[in-house]
Design a protein with these regions (language model features):
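Hydrophobic faces of well-ordered beta-strands that scaffold small-molecule active sites
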Residues: 1, 28-35, 65-66, 91-95, ...
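Alpha-helix-loop-beta-strand connector modules within alpha/beta enzyme cores
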Residues: 8-32, 80-93, 138-154
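Glycine-rich, proline-tolerant flexible connector loops at the mouths of alpha/beta enzymes
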Residues: 1-18, 36-41, 68-76, 99, ...
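Active-site mouth loops of central-metabolism enzymes
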Residues: 34-49, 68-70, 95-107, 153-161
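Catalytic cores of alpha/beta
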Residues: 110-111, 161-173
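Conserved small/polar residues in nucleotide/adenosyl-binding loops
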Residues: 192-194
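Hydrophobic alpha-helical hairpins/lids featuring a short glycine-rich hinge
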Residues: 44-87
């Protein structure tokens, strides 16, 4: 949404914004969310466009690419992962968390193994709607820590009011990183505060 907001609403160049941030914080790794073959847009793009966009992102200062497909179809993230790795940057394979009768702990573990097999540098559990329960998070992360070797990140929104406890249980299970926000921009639809 950053690229879309810059162009559509602010009449700004998103690349210029990125360069300014990198200049102001040269030692801070810059991260972006990449929707696999959708990049930062709302349709699928060709492999050539995906490659050029990632190369341009690297050139302008992105270090870590959090790559996902909304339907967890890894065919839609594979090319992005390959190009990020080819450019010497961090590819974070991401699972878009949801709840259904088929989404068991083992379903998520199997998907995480496939993500690790893509040569991702880390895994992110992306709970964009805040529906990951504390106990499911504990069970899932405990099992993932036994089954995969790459670092595990948790991104969960405060939408449902469970995220504080969910993050606490994730830490108890051994998660490597949790995403947080500064207090003035936290909670509600955002992340928990530091």
């Amino acid at each position: 949404a950053i690229f879309d907001s810059c162009v559509r609403y602010l009449d700004e160049d998103p690349w210029e914004r990125l360069r300014e941030l990198k200049k102001a914080m040269p030692k801070t790794k810059q991260q972006m969310l990449l929707r696999g073959q959708n990049l930062v847009g709302y349709k699928h793009y060709s492999d050539e466009i995906v490659s050029k966009f990632i190369e341009k992102s690297v050139l302008n200062g992105i270090d870590i690419f959090r790559i996902f497909d909304a339907l967890n179809d890894l065919r839609n993230i594979k090319h992005s992962v390959d190009i990020v790795k080819k450019n010497g940057k961090h590819a974070q394979g991401t699972m878009a968390y949801t709840i259904s009768p088929v989404h068991t702990v083992q379903t998520w573990v199997d998907l995480a193994k496939e993500i690790e097999d893509l040569d991702c540098d880390s895994l992110c559990i992306k709970d964009m709607s805040g529906i990951l329960s504390p106990e499911f998070a504990y069970d899932l992360i405990s099992k993932l820590k036994k089954e995969i070797s790459i670092p595990i990140h948790l991104h969960t929104h405060a939408t449902t009011g469970m995220s504080n406890l969910t993050n606490m249980r994730a830490v108890e299970a051994g998660v490597d990183n949790i995403d947080t926000s500064i207090s003035s921009m936290s909670m509600g639809l955002s992340l928990i505060h530091i």
